[in-house]
Amino acid sequence: MSIFIPKARRPTFELHLRIHDVVNIPLITGVIFVKWNIEGIHSRHANDQTEAEPVLEHRVTWEYETCVSVRMIIDNDNLLKDKFLILQVLCDSHTDSGVIRLGILKINLTEYVYVGQDTRKYLLADSKINATIRIGISLKQTSGNKDFRVSKTLGKPQVFSGLTGLLTDGKELKRRDDEVYTSTGLASAWAEKMLHSIKDFNQKTTVFHMHTRNNKYDTREIVDDIFFGGTGWAEPPKIADIVDAAGDTDLISLEIRQKSWVLPSEKVLNKRLP
């Protein structure tokens, strides 16, 4: 039990949590709220929820902010044990179905120990939709031993791992779209719009042939940079440096996969064909 662990091996951190918004919600009515808790901590300060806000243009905004104290444990190998923040995105449509869970997000707080403040979008897990939640987290140690290791540091934004994953194989997006399409028809128009956007984005990335001798970005980094408003170039390009990307296996692979994706409207058309 943690009560028998020396105080020096139970460092305390001040967690600042900001919940900004959830976007790409395939609903036109209803209210959305987010419940959060810190796994393994049952005190009142370690769980709360945002206000329930209405869906407007497939988005809900809160700008919710809170600050809590979190105690972690350093094990015998001098490793800071994982401590998870869990967020559930819930929807109340004011119907007989009651409150339903749109998705969940599980974040390992130990990854934020050496990061400071960070704000990013995450693709919801355990979900049939492609909604993303934008949150901000900062973690500051206030007491205890600071001589410890962490098992994993914070990597690239998960939402972008999710997006490039969609561009790489498309399996998760197709699975979610299939489930939406074969259910009650909820948000099929939204799902098709989302797929059109992804296919168009992938096609543009392929056509641009953004490989150059002076570009330090690989294909994945090019997509990441364009998604966040960049040009896809590590440095301003020179026309003379642009090379023919016809033999680029990564871009060819993207093009093949892009052609293999099927939109809901295309499914209907195929069913109608003799």
Curated annotation (Swiss-Prot):
One GO cellular component term: cell cortex
Source superkingdom: Eukaryota
Pfam families (alphabetical): NT-C2
Molecular functions per Gene Ontology: lipid binding
Residue span, C2 NT-type domain: 3-141
PANTHER family in UniProt: C2 NT-TYPE DOMAIN-CONTAINING PROTEIN (PTHR21456:SF1), FAMILY WITH SEQUENCE SIMILARITY 102 (PTHR21456)
Family: To yeast YBL086c.
Annotated protein name in UniProt: Uncharacterized protein C1494.08c
